[in-house]
Curated annotation (Swiss-Prot):
InterPro entries, per the entry: BMP3/BMP3B, Cystine-knot_cytokine, TGF-b_C, TGF-beta-rel, TGFb_CS
PANTHER family linked: GROWTH_DIFFERENTIATION FACTOR 10, TGF-BETA FAMILY
Protein name per UniProt: Growth/differentiation factor 10
Segments of skewed composition (Basic residues): 331-343
Signal peptide: 1-33
Chain's gene name: GDF10
A GO cellular-component term linked to this record: extracellular space
Amino acid sequence: MARGPARTSLGPGSQQLPLLSLLLLLLLRDADGSHTAAARPPPPAAADGLAGDKNPQRSPGDVAAAQSPGAQDMVAVHMLRLYEKYSRRGARPGGGNTVRSFRARLEVVNQKAVYFFNLTSMQDSEMILTATFHFYSEPQWPPAREVPCKQRAKNASCRLLPPGPPARQHLLFRSLSQNTATQGLLRGAMALPPPPRGLWQAKDISLIVKAARRDGELLLSAQLDSGEKDTGVPRLGPHAPYILIYANDLAISEPNSVAVTLQRYDPFQAGDPEPGAAPNSSADPRVRRATQATGPLQNNELPGLDERPAQAPHAQHYHKHELWPNPLRALKPRPGRKDRRKKGQDVFMASSQVLDFDEKTMQKARKKQWDEPRVCSRRYLKVDFADIGWNEWIISPKSFDAYYCSGACEFPMPKMVRPSNHATIQSIVRAVGIVPGIPEPCCVPDKMSSLGVLFLDENRNVVLKVYPNMSVETCACR
């Protein structure tokens, strides 16, 4: 009978003690984990606030950082996030149009790790806006001190005193005139407060980079100096530093700028004949626009049913009335159904040069061309960089919707083609016919949008450029 009360009296205590012990163990484990667990590096900090982006949907840059083999390559991950940001928001990177990244080359100088950056790939037309140095910093704890063992105690044990405060680091920048591991000219020094844990940091080095470029010394070295010599052999790992330079390329709006920066070789090498050139023609690497066969894709006109390839060199030049039969001309009133039944075939047969198709085929062709607008308008065109041989160095996008403008600008021009005053007068003069040889206005792009391209330069550095006038938004007669 005595066992029953004892069991009931100990019951509540036996339930509370395990709970308290479990809670204490969890607290101790969390406290130890805050000091011993390996810190996971956050996304690289940048002046544009990418690290603070809390989009719940994972972007391709985040997926690449977590899954791809190059997940440790923070340069590629950071540049991909910049590309996604400016492609999505349509903004200009740092107020400019160019972001260049530069990887570090590790050298050991006086038993200390020194990181070298080759900035010579910057173009003269690129005006530097800002430059940031991205590096991974960890607290440098001094070695712990050992406490002498107490011999008087029954269970004598030795312990280590907790280490003192972490050492203060200095970030040193030097510029070099030659690509050698020398001291160089000191360009700047920054005192870094000890970080609470291992994390990525970014420092503004715009003045340093601008001064080095002004003096023609585009080889920079960076060193994290804590006063102690590095133990072991330094290696470039996943935490290698890098430099980002935001610039405004003044030549990006010049004609043919996209080919100047993205084309790695001439498609028509010197000595190689151009496609379609005569066997005994001279090997001039320049593209001869005047001698190229003129077709509907070159003169912004849609092909007609009776268009056939030229049979002789003198047959390359056509007049509009020779290529377009009367029923297919734009802005002509469509005849009634009864008139088409009676006169449609006779009129078409009298003006067309194609006589080898049956009536059913011709009706299908006529219906297809009536469905497609003949007036000046935007047409769909998708450009794949693999088709022009640029996919080897272009990272993203692989393709884009470029569109193009094509169609007729005949008098009277509707409002939808947004003709200029000059185009309106030109179409009237052409329609009157007093001045011979006046062509009709051309269907050209009116409004265009830019395109961000992420690619590798000749030094295998990742570059982001926002090219203007890459995709057609609207077309007009000019």
